[in-house]
Design a protein with these regions (language model features):
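Conserved acidic segment of CheY-like receiver
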Residues: 2-14, 18-22
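Hydrophobic/aromatic residues located in beta-strands of well-ordered beta-sheets
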Residues: 5, 30, 91-92
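Short acidic, S/G/P-rich loop/turn micro-motifs used as interaction or catalytic elements
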Residues: 11-15, 61-67, 97-100
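A structural signal for short coil/turn segments at secondary-structure junctions
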Residues: 25-26, 50, 86
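Acidic, metal-coordinating helix/loop segments flanking the phosphotransfer/catalytic sites
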Residues: 32-55, 59, 63-64
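Conserved phosphotransfer microenvironments
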Residues: 53-86
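A short, hydrophobic beta-strand element within the central beta-sheet of small alpha/beta folds
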Residues: 77-101, 106-108
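Receiver (REC) domain switch/output surface
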Residues: 97, 116-130
């Protein structure tokens, strides 16, 4: 059975790179959204349909809603919403900023000087074993 993941990221390049790493570890169905509001809507829809997400992966700096500018607080805002409304859903922060969020399942610094791919793989493997 495929791991169902929602990925909140406004960069197509980062989305492709992260998806490639995920699919090297688990069979995954990855839904990609580029803003917080659309992500929350998709999470609600998935729950209503009886097919909730197994994991959310979020950037830190992207739009809060469609057609808006990127917001540096978007990732933290998303993690807060998930903690309040969807506590069952683990969140991995994967950002070009080396930021830690204590409410996230894990944080990955997306940077070429860091083994971000190995870090993400390890988090996915650990979560898949649960």
């Amino acid at each position: 059975m495929a791991f169902k993941i929602i990925h909140l990221e406004d960069s197509a390049m980062k989305h492709s790179a992260i998806s490639r790493v995920i699919k090297s570890v688990v069979s995954a169905e990855i839904d990609w959204v580029t803003d917080v509001a659309t992500g929350i809507d998709k999470i609600n829809d998935a729950i209503s349909e009886g097919n909730p997400y197994d994991l959310a992966i979020t950037d830190m700096h992207y739009p809060l809603s469609p057609e808006k500018e990127a917001d540096p607080e978007a990732g933290d805002f998303f993690v807060d919403i998930v903690k309040q409304k969807f506590d069952h859903l683990p969140v991995i922060v994967c950002s070009t900023y080396s930021i830690k969020n204590p409410d996230a399942y894990g944080c990955v610094w997306f940077n070429e000087i860091n083994d971000w791919e190995g870090n993400l793989r390890n988090l996915i493997i650990k979560l898949a074993k649960k």
